[in-house]
Amino acid sequence: MSTEYNYEISYGKMCIPLYRVYAAPLTGVAPIPESAFTGRENTLLAAEVDVEVSGGNFIAAYTHGDNRNIVATDSMKNFVLKHALTFEGSTLEEFLHLLGHAFLATYAQIERVRLTGRELAFTAASVPQRGVFGAS
């Protein structure tokens, strides 16, 4: 009796640092009772992004040493950074949405992609400006 197995491989690149200077301002956010947040200037949009790709197309790399379908993890990092440079949106969620579509459109061998992002808070520091302290 033979048993057929279905395998799926997943791998990726974690903690890709992303810094987008002067991203589009986030404005017009309706406040909710729990928060007074209505937007931010986005002088610096900073985050860490994790990429995990999966699918059956990567099996040959593990069973036959055939890496033709593998997307190198450094290529994943470079792909994230390249798309951050041209990102015109205001939120990390929007960036991850666009990035996920771009991964799937660019690399046909990827069946699924999981993206996780952690936004890093940026608070402007006070710096001397014409004899007084102002926001950096």
State where each predicted segment sits.
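N-terminal intrinsically disordered, cationic/polar leader segments
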Residues: M1-S136
